[in-house]
Amino acid sequence: TSIGAGVNIAVAQYFGAKKETDIQESISVSYLIAVIASIFLTAACFLAARPVIFGFLQAPEEMRFDSMAYFLIYSGGIIFQLLYNVTYGILRAHGDSRGALIFLMISAALNIVLDCVFISVFHMGVSGAAAATVIAQAGSAIASFLYLRHIFPDLLPKRRYLYAWKGQGALLMRLSIPIMLQTGVNSIGFLILQRLINSFGAPSIEGYAAMLKVEQLAHIPSQSFNVAISSFAGQNIGAEKLDRARRGYRTTILMGVLISISISIVVLLFDRPLLQIFNITGESLRRAKEHLDILMFFIWTSTITNI
């Protein structure tokens, strides 16, 4: 995500300043960084799987096999996540918010549909949930790249621009590191929370996993507004129109909060049927509903943070 955000900021500013060569260089280098980073991250995840799941997270004995399977399958799709995020960032930077939004929504919807198919129809359990996520990410990565190739062929990565990897790579990392640190802190917090949830047993773990899926749907508006404002602000900053960027930011905050509150109300009204889509019942459903109902009262704060 941080690499995609970095290329979005860089390309948007270059686009606003009409620096065509810099646009090509940053795009080409960003894909190179994504491929290299995915190799190292995938290897690190495979090596860390056992100590993280069995040690730090202290997964219950009866769930360790499923936890390992989910983690390893999900880690195998890291390359698709990074490539999709880079392409997504390029589309956003170019001002194609509609195309970027469509692929974001398709990815989320496909993930939910495949979850239902793999879990409810084929009874694949958590392995099916992981496979659904990876397939959705792979489909989005391929489809978005083909879209980029068809609509904006000039924005495709080109080998002759890789010579600029030092300068553009340093810029992309400088833009990505703050977002990377924020994401890292959130991830550490998530791991600590997951460890605490694991201590309450299988019903809490199953309920929390289902709740996260519904939460992802509730977060789509804030992610969409983030898509719009980051590109809008980047292009205007590149064109030295700072007042316009500030007005856009304030308007986006207002719209994002209002829509997030509306979605929270809908989720609170239909929380039980939404959670039952993921085949949870009894105590797992009760705990998921309790967690989701509390979370929905504060989802608007996440919208402000994302924007």
Kindly give the residue locations of the regions a language model identified:
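Alpha-helical transmembrane segments of multi-pass membrane proteins
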Residues: 61-84, 216, 282-305
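Short membrane-interface helical motifs at transmembrane helix boundaries
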Residues: 40-68, 72, 262-289
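Hydrophobic transmembrane alpha-helices of multi-pass small-molecule transporters
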Residues: 42, 111-116, 141-145, 217-220, ...
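Helix-terminus/linker motif at the lipid-water interface of multi-pass membrane proteins
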Residues: 53-61, 117-124, 184-217, 235, ...
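Membrane-interface helix-loop junctions in multi-pass transport and translocation proteins
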Residues: 108-142, 271-273, 286
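Residue-level signature of transmembrane alpha-helical cores of multipass secondary-active transporters
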Residues: 34, 74, 100, 104, ...
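Interhelical loop/hinge segments that connect adjacent transmembrane helices in multipass membrane
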Residues: 133, 142-186
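Small-residue-rich hydrophobic transmembrane alpha-helices
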Residues: 1-42, 81-100, 207-271, 305-307
